[in-house]
UniProtKB/Swiss-Prot annotation:
GO biological process, one term: tRNA wobble uridine modification
Reactions it catalyzes: carboxy-S-adenosyl-L-methionine + 5-hydroxyuridine(34) in tRNA = 5-carboxymethoxyuridine(34) in tRNA + S-adenosyl-L-homocysteine + H(+)
Enzyme class: transferase
Binding sites annotated in the UniProt record for carboxy-S-adenosyl-L-methionine: 91, 105, 110, 130, 152-154, 181-182, 196, 200, 315
Family annotation (HAMAP family): tRNA_carboxymethyltr_CmoB
Name the UniProt record assigns to this protein: tRNA U34 carboxymethyltransferase
GO molecular function: methyltransferase activity; transferase activity, transferring alkyl or aryl (other than methyl) groups
Keyword set, alphabetical order: Transferase, tRNA processing
Function recorded in the entry: Catalyzes carboxymethyl transfer from carboxy-S-adenosyl-L-methionine (Cx-SAM) to 5-hydroxyuridine (ho5U) to form 5-carboxymethoxyuridine (cmo5U) at position 34 in tRNAs.
InterPro entries: CmoB, Mo5U34_MeTrfas-like, SAM-dependent_MTases_sf
Record flagged with keyword tRNA processing: yes
Originating species: Salmonella newport (strain SL254)
Family (UniProt): Belongs to the class I-like SAM-binding methyltransferase superfamily. CmoB family.
Length: 323
């Protein structure tokens, strides 16, 4: 059973303590009523993983854990099999005692694009909205964060996160909660808030920006990464039924339009830090994610377009500050 008591004890002693007025009841309701049909199978995979304490742990350059002496073939096989029971692995990669999880996304590439533009994360309390398996939570800790909290309602991601945590020595500096941003009160408690790969899935993107702002302390920093299209501050793509085979894509603004949205929501010092086209080297099918990936979502005769005829995915990073 995945428990959250350690997190409750941790925040009871800091400036997140007021979250305890609502959070335990929400988690209890989730445990009673909302668990996925495969959750028991996934949580069993986590439970059966061995307790490991890394001899060498690198969260600064990657997410890598090593033992002092190589694991036996049987130990490696056990870890590998249990981690494969948590497929598909979308966000990573992870290197855990000789088991290399080659995830669909090279999330380390995204981190390398984002990191140079951030305020120093040393000592910061961070929220990562839609954090997936929690890969970036560990990289935030590697960059000096005091506490990294991720929220994502996808229960497979929770189990993947807890599996990695167990293999990292039960590290308590990062935590993942199975919640959506709309379930959080206005905590106004995080020094940095990340929203990466979420905005285009929201029916009301400006409401999402307000929700993110409500989580930041005054002078806190927002890091927003999302799909964009080319154009000026009035350009927004509203896809039809699907975009790159995804049904739940609602609004894809240009980077200048997104900057304007942030300013309309009251953010200041808004800047476009990076814009780049997503490549089939960064998002692709692997043995840890065996279904369709980006190459299958692009027009085979014109890779600058999706199969639906829209511009192929490009992503922007915007940095903003709450006054």
């Amino acid at each position: 059973m995945i428990e959250f008591g350690n997190f409750y004890q941790l925040i009871a002693k800091n400036h997140l303590s007021h979250w305890l007025e609502t959070l335990p009841a929400q988690i209890a309701a989730w445990q009673r009523e909302q668990q996925h049909g495969l959750f028991k199978q996934w949580s069993n995979a986590v439970e059966f993983l061995p307790e490991m304490t890394p001899w060498r742990l690198d969260l600064l350059h990657s997410v890598t854990a090593e033992s002092e002496t190589p694991l036996s073939e049987g130990q490696l096989k056990r870890i590998d099999t249990l981690l494969r029971n948590l497929m598909p692995w979308r966000k990573g990669p992870f290197s855990l005692y000789g088991v290399d999880i080659d995830t669909e996304w090279r999330s380390d590439w995204k981190w390398d694009r984002v990191l140079p533009h951030l305020s120093d994360l040393t000592g910061r309390t961070i929220l990562d909205v839609g954090c997936g398996s929690g890969y970036h939570l560990w990289r935030m800790i590697g960059a000096g964060a005091h506490l990294a909290v991720g929220i994502d309602p996808t229960q497979l991601f929770l189990c993947q996160f807890e599996a990695v945590r167990k293999l990292l020595g039960n590290d308590q500096r990062a935590h993942l909660l199975p919640l959506g941003i709309e379930q959080l009160p206005a905590l106004k408690a995080f020094d940095t808030v990340f929203s990466m790969g979420v905005l285009y899935h929201r029916r009301s993107p400006l409401e999402h920006l307000w929700q993110l702002k409500d989580q930041l302390v005054n002078e806190g920093e927002l890091v927003l990464e999302t799909l964009v299209v080319d154009g000026d501050e009035n350009t927004v793509l509203v896809p039809g039924d699907r975009y790159a085979q995804m049904r739940n894509v609602y609004f894809i603004p240009s980077a200048p339009a997104l900057k304007k949205w942030l300013e309309k929501c009251g953010f200041i010092d808004v800047r476009i830090a990076d814009v780049c086209v997503t490549t089939t080297e960064e998002q692709r099918r692997t043995e840890w994610m065996v279904t369709e990936s980006l190459a299958d979502f692009l027009d085979p005769n014109d890779r600058s377009k999706t199969v639906e005829g829209y511009p192929a995915p490009q992503r922007a990073v915007l940095i903003a500050r709450k006054p």
